[in-house]
Amino acid sequence: MDDSKLRYFASAWLISITLPADSAERYNAQFVNGIDPLAFNQFVASDGDVMPGTYDVNIYINDLLVDSRPVRFSEDSAHGGLAPCLSAAEYIRYGVKIDDDHQPCFALSQTIRQAEQQLDIANHRLIIHIPQQYIEHYPRDYVSPMRFDEGINAAFVNYSYSTDANNGDGGSHQYQYLSLNSGINIASWRLRNNAYWNKFSGQADKWQSIASWAETNIIPWRSRLVVGQTSTDNSVFDSVQFRGVQLGTDAEMRPSSQTGFAPVIRGVANSNARVEVRQNNYLIYSENVPAGPFELNDISAVNRSGDFYVTVIEADGSQTTFTVAYTTLPQLVRAGQWNYQLSAGKYHDGADGYAPALMQSSLSYGLNNTFTLYGGALAAENYRAGAFGVGSNLGEIGALSADYTLAGTTLANGQRKQGGSVRFLYAKSFLSSKTDFQIAGYRYSTAGYYSLSDAVNERRRWHNGLYENDYWPSDEDESWQASAPQHYYTSWFYNKKHRFDISARQTLGKNSAFFLNFSQQNYWNSSGSDISLQAGFNSTIHNVNYGLYYQNTRSHFTHDDNSITLRVSIPFTLQENRRINTAFTLAHSKSSGTSGQAGVNGTLLDDGRLSWAVTSAYDDTSHSTNSASLGYLGQYGNLYTGYAYSKSHRQASLNLSGGVVAHRGGVTLSQPLGSTFALVEAKDAQGVGIENQTGVRIDPFGYAVVPQSVPYRVNSVALNP
């Protein structure tokens, strides 16, 4: 079972009845659902004993579920009752320390005298107890690979559609955006495609396929094979996208105790707004949000590195932009573990121009409980690189990694450059001071060093002996708005020099916290820097939540913006699942001036699946905007609608999102799908809810989709009448 596979659950009510020891056991077939009463009587003898035969059972060894399959049972003349027919090889796969006698039925009790076996036919269980010294030691959350389920054959589409219509003094226009993540599961193979469509009134629509690939698991190696468009990991080299073939470790197959990361994007909308997120030239996210602070925690990165460029488009058409840095600390590997990745294909990042063939390998090994060794090699057209590093668990000091990369590059003008880059990464939580350094990193590169992406961009920007560079108009005009870049030409290329990143959180008392995210990138042949700074303070006093936030974004090509925001909210709980929250916001930014807003929002219905909000906003030009929105988490998808108006402007917006799953039982509509989801079958249970799933109910055909499940883990699904 994989993080992009579909799993199938069938529900059944099972009841076990135990009578006093001096009484023969009797079974009532009506209490054992999922078994025909006539068939039940065929395997229960007249004296109450279970008859020999083959039964579908869940196999438990020392209370750990290790397998689910048919098992043949025969009479046990030595001990009475029934004995399962399991081979020694099967017991070994279940973690029992025995030798393989190559016989179809291994006599467990003859080899391990203290072993006990019991068939619980009412609950479809084969219960085996074995002394611990005969059992391999597994982590507490271990799941046997034999239980990994490839899932059913199925097809699905996960969609998100948003549109807004605007009318104002400048005329009328409409914007539409549709994101489709689709897939087909056939046996152990999974075919996937991510694509989007968008259209702005008066312009031609645009359809783009972002990525297509096929993948399958190689469970004995705890690995995954991918064919198509994917990206290399960033544990050694910077991650790059490519089209080709990749084989590598899938760490999620390991237990949680033996084993990642996407940034949460935060901001403030002054009115009903659309938020767009771009990475590596792709529009990867577009969502309508109501006025007030927003938090995007479901971003799927196109690449494992590459900053996120966020644009907030307000109801009146004004825009603000900022950058969220995306860097991660390579995970330390446990002693004796290996992580590897082999990639081969052609560079593909969504942009036109030079795209070299490449081959890359990376390997990390847990030398002991303190040190991890890692390194790799990268070969591409006009480019070679090798790297080696050491990661260390320093105990109370924290976790630190250091690596060095040596690279040789042939530039577009034929010059051969060689240089090195050293990188340090650090992470530490100081419990005594409640300080958490989630990421602290520094990289320095010599003038002759080019990463692969730098080498590709150097050739793409080369035109008639000069390099083309982008820049934005001067930001001295405080009414500056995001616009298309302009170009100028130089005789040198701005390759990266040094970069510093830090992400930290400081807890203050019981109800307060301060956070800081900072990134700075400097370049050779340029005195400017790219800077991104986000800082904030959150606290609660007597049920009143408040926060102060600061944000600054600066490009080494002139444009910059900064903002400061004060937010106060007071929640009220009327009754269970019916909440009201009042919020007040005051903000000032270089690009938008001063603005403020006040609003009320809440939830309705028994499970809180209906949300609503009303907001009034103003700015320092006496321009006010009023807005209202409704959101609904439905059985067949999610709906959001909003309306905003001012003296000179009107905007109506709509979001529709959900999933469509086609399977052998038909077609089932659902809420938006995660990368792993489950299909539930419960006939004659129309309208019954699923436990811990807001808005998810059994449809008229007896099916429902649980949109989020955890891969390679035991997931519990239950009906909630």
How should each PLM-predicted stretch be described?
Residues 172-178, 206-210, 261, 336, ...:
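Residues that define the transmembrane beta-barrel architecture of outer-membrane proteins
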